[in-house]
Design a protein with these regions (language model features):
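A contiguous loop/helix-start segment that scaffolds small-molecule binding in enzyme catalytic cores
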Residues: 2-6, 18-20, 78, 149-234
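Glycine-centered, small-residue-biased loops immediately flanking beta-strands
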Residues: 255, 278, 353
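Class I SAM-dependent methyltransferase SAM-binding "motif I" and its flanking Rossmann-like core
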Residues: 12-13, 83-147, 313, 373-391, ...
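Conserved class I S-adenosyl-L-methionine
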Residues: 254-263
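Class I S-adenosyl-L-methionine
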Residues: 1-105, 114, 277-280, 284-286, ...
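S-adenosyl-L-methionine
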Residues: 285-323, 330
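C-terminal substrate-binding/active-site "lid" region of AdoMet-derived donor-dependent transferases
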Residues: 342-404
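Conserved SAM-binding loop of SAM-dependent methyltransferases across substrates and taxa
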Residues: 264-276
Length: 405
């Protein structure tokens, strides 16, 4: 059985350890950590010890750990050096995930965001923590949309102060003061500074965002504020209908929302603003709509909508749903291919997932989408819920249709 002792360190080239930890190091035979960690602790390691570099792919690293376990019947102890608090987005979490049977003892130090808050004399009990280290933008987007007052960000070399600042500017989040901490804990290299677009920021670094002003968006984004397809006012789901549609989708308890036939993107954008926890996949066949949804998303501060262009019937639904299956789907347009589209949706729809469509009753509309919907639900074994009929001003009546798996 493997035993791990995980010791947190800062970027200080002359680390301080309590006597208990120093004794553990003196008795150690197998050590592990990143190359930077090795440089810092090398003077403290006993002679004739083994060091295992923590590099990607991590499966190779854990393969070496497991080989050590098989060489002796006795318990093997591996002493791992990790940054800051090893249980704070750290390597101790990875050990628990990869080797849940292993025995782990942790000796933490302050993590980088704690140190940055300390340097700024900034209370951080309400800090929203976002890790972008090897991760996508979802959690940062969510924190910005929610208007969190204090956001601490763990960066990597790709998602760095400049790319983060650019993304925030693109979507209108200029209401935050950005402070960057570099090489925290290293007396010679540590630097705390406000964001400067001309600066070169060294790695490792972390970021603190402090909100300087609130942004208020109404419940129901005004239709007139959206860029439209060829200026056609009827090519947008009107705000009251949009809100009723989102209500029918049960989005507060959903995880993955697909918007098929997004056109201006109004439904996706409204959903993103109201329910930023959602993963949103938006589909559209008309190429001119791609620029429109991106323009509207930037205008309304709705980052993180994944856009897919092309005929939905040609989309590989399985590849889009690789990580999570959709549990809420809105069909905003079907081009007369409703049954085929619904069949493709049902092939990847999560258990208890819902599909919603708005059926328009107009004199010049020859295709009865309500009838096609009823037939598709029956053929696909979907359970329909009572429809909701509504008419807005002098527009054509709309029936909000809903079914579930």
């Amino acid at each position: 059985m493997l035993r791990f002792v995980v010791i947190g360190i800062t970027d200080n080239p002359q680390p301080f350890f309590p006597p208990e930890v120093l004794e553990i190091i003196r008795q150690g035979k197998v050590f592990s950590g990143g190359k930077r960690h090795h440089e810092i602790v090398a003077p403290l390691l006993p002679d004739d010890t083994q060091w295992i570099d923590i590099t990607v792919p991590l499966d190779d690293v854990f393969g070496q750990y497991k080989q050590l376990c098989g060489k002796t019947a006795e318990q093997t102890t591996i002493i791992v050096f990790a940054s800051g608090d090893p249980l704070f987005f750290g390597f101790a979490n990875t050990i628990q995930r990869k080797m849940p049977e292993a025995d782990i003892k942790v000796y933490p130090t302050f993590n980088s965001l704690q140190m940055l808050a300390h340097r700024m004399a900034l209370p951080y009990h309400d800090m929203q923590i976002v890790s972008l280290t090897g991760r996508d933008w979802q959690k940062l987007d969510e924190a910005l949309i929610r208007g969190e007052s204090l956001i601490g960000i763990l960066t990597d070399r790709q998602k760095n102060p400049h790319t983060i600042h650019q993304r925030m500017s693109d979507y209108g989040y200029t209401n935050y003061q950005m402070t960057i901490g570099e090489h925290l804990g290293n007396p010679e290299q540590e630097r705390i500074s406000s964001y400067d677009e001309k600066a070169v920021y060294s790695h490792p670094n972390c970021i603190m965002l402090q909100k300087t002003a609130s942004q208020v968006h109404p419940l129901g984004l005004p239709d007139a504020a959206f860029s439209l397809l060829d200026g056609r006012e009827k090519m947008i789901t009107k705000m009251p209908i949009r809100l009723l549609t989102l209500q029918a989708l049960d989005l507060p308890k959903r995880h993955v929302f697909w918007d098929i036939g997004f056109c201006t993107g109004s439904v996706s954008i409204e959903a993103r603003r109201l329910f930023p926890h959602l993963q949103i996949e938006a589909f559209e066949i008309r190429p001119e709509c791609e620029a429109i949804i991106h323009e509207n998303a930037r205008r309304f501060g709705a980052p993180g909508i994944h856009v897919h262009m092309g005929d939905f019937r040609s989309v590989c639904c399985d590849s889009v749903a690789t990580n999570e299956k959709p549990d809420a789907v809105f069909i905003g347009g079907h081009g007369g291919h409703l049954k085929e589209i619904m069949a493709r949706v049902v092939s990847v729809l999560a258990p208890d997932g819902v599909i919603v469509m708005n059926s328009v009753k107009a004199p010049l509309v020859t295709t009865d989408s309500h009838q096609l919907w009823n037939e598709a639900c029956r053929e696909l074994g979907l359970t329909q819920e009572p429809p909701m009929r509504i008419q807005l001003n002098d527009n054509h009546p709309i029936t909000i249709l809903k079914c579930r798996r």
